[in-house]
């Protein structure tokens, strides 16, 4: 069972109680802090759509600390990030691995950040299937298509040649925040929000 902190906001004579995620959403902040699955994707997509409707001109900020997760769920978030009108600023705090790294790289160019001690990791999709030989073959072909799709998305957002992405994703490929900047996954390593 997880405990969600609450925040009490006072304005004049009234008090308003928010769960922490709702309060962050009020400031146009979305936090992805778990493995990415269908439930997480649906919540993030709903938040993106809500924030676009609320003000299509103001940036949306996505903070990421995730080991990755389901490719289909991550691609649903990715497509929505590309679909909405507001710029999406992405921030890696802790880790952005696998599908979470794709989302980090998919932020608006110039607005992709990593904190100094965060790590990112790219690799090929992982899948396992058993059953009849024909079904195994169908799933193997599908995972290879997903591998090509994800490699092309990473190449598009990082500016790296597809051949380099293909080579680097063959195995787990870890990067520090500075290495992620050199790779093109983030634009800047930041240590403070203060200006």
From Swiss-Prot:
Keywords: Cytoplasm, Hydrolase, Protease, Serine protease. GO terms for molecular function: ATP-dependent peptidase activity; ATPase binding; serine-type endopeptidase activity. Its EC number is 3.4.21.92. Disulfide bonds: none annotated. It catalyses: Hydrolysis of proteins to small peptides in the presence of ATP and magnesium. alpha-casein is the usual test substrate. In the absence of ATP, only oligopeptides shorter than five residues are hydrolyzed (such as succinyl-Leu-Tyr-|-NHMec, and Leu-Tyr-Leu-|-Tyr-Trp, in which cleavage of the -Tyr-|-Leu- and -Tyr-|-Trp bonds also occurs). Its main location: cytoplasm. One of its GO terms (cellular component) is endopeptidase Clp complex. The active site is at 98 (nucleophile), 123. SUPFAM superfamilies: ClpP/crotonase. One of its GO terms (biological process) is protein quality control for misfolded or incompletely synthesized proteins. It is found in: Cytoplasm. PROSITE patterns: CLP_PROTEASE_HIS. Cleaves peptides in various proteins in a process that requires ATP hydrolysis. Has a chymotrypsin-like activity. Plays a major role in the degradation of misfolded proteins. NCBIfam families: clpP, PRK00277.1, PRK12553.1. Fourteen ClpP subunits assemble into 2 heptameric rings which stack back to back to give a disk-like structure with a central cavity, resembling the structure of eukaryotic proteasomes. Belongs to the peptidase S14 family. HAMAP family: ClpP. This is ATP-dependent Clp protease proteolytic subunit. It comes from Thermodesulfovibrio yellowstonii (strain ATCC 51303 / DSM 11347 / YP87). The gene is clpP.
């Amino acid at each position: 069972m997880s405990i969600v902190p609450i925040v009490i906001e006072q304005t004049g004579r009234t008090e308003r109680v928010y769960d922490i995620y709702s309060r962050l959403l009020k400031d146009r902040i979305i936090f992805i802090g778990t493995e990415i699955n269908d439930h997480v994707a649906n919540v993030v997509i709903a938040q993106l759509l809500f924030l676009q409707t609320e003000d299509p001109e103001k940036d949306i900020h996505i903070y990421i600390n995730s080991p990755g997760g389901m490719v289909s769920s991550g691609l649903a978030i990715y497509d929505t990030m590309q679909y909405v009108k507001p710029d999406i600023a992405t921030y890696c705090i802790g880790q952005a691995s696998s599908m979470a790294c794709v989302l980090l790289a998919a932020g608006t160019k110039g607005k992709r950040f990593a904190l100094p001690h965060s790590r990112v990791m790219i690799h090929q999709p992982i899948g396992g299937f058993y059953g009849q030989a024909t079904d195994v073959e169908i799933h193997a072909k599908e995972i290879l298509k997903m591998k090509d799709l994800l490699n092309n998305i990473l190449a598009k957002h990082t500016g790296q040649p597809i051949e380099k992405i293909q080579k680097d994703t063959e195995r787990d490929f870890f990067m520090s925040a500075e290495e992620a900047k050199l790779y093109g996954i983030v634009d800047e390593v930041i240590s403070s929000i203060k200006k």
